């Protein structure tokens, strides 16, 4: 589970790295400054949390409760959808690497820039994924950890988050050197592989929690 968390935060926290660069370089910011997009995630957290908790509660009352390991796997899939959307969009637009794009004439850059709705869709998927993974994952670790190791396991969760953040520098390297769709495709693959690993452990993890 901690390994999954590393790759989730490595992908999710690109919102402060390559996704912010994408907002600066490839999105028309004439109406909205790139830094404003940092507020979209907190906004979605506030709006979507009650809705998602209501859905979980509804399923539980119907006897169809989704286990926490399955929720984490679903969260990785949803995060993958965000990068799938970006990869397909960037491929359809024919975006080159960021370094190549910034070398184009200004008029050509402006004509190719995306509308702000692209970021809205991306952050929506990433925020939903965060709500499936971040609070539920920490709760799961606290639940399955031996009482004598509870503090250690919670610390390992935070260490996994920190390690994911330490890997963030890889995103800008790909963003600047590769066609943009390839950059997003790497994060898509990371999310889908993590989902597959989690699904492979689901039954075992569900037995552990019973």
Please name every model-derived segment:
Residues 206-210:
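Short, charged juxtamembrane terminal tails flanking transmembrane helices
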Residues 1-22, 27, 34-136, 140-204:
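Membrane-embedded alpha-helical bundles of multi-pass transporters/translocases
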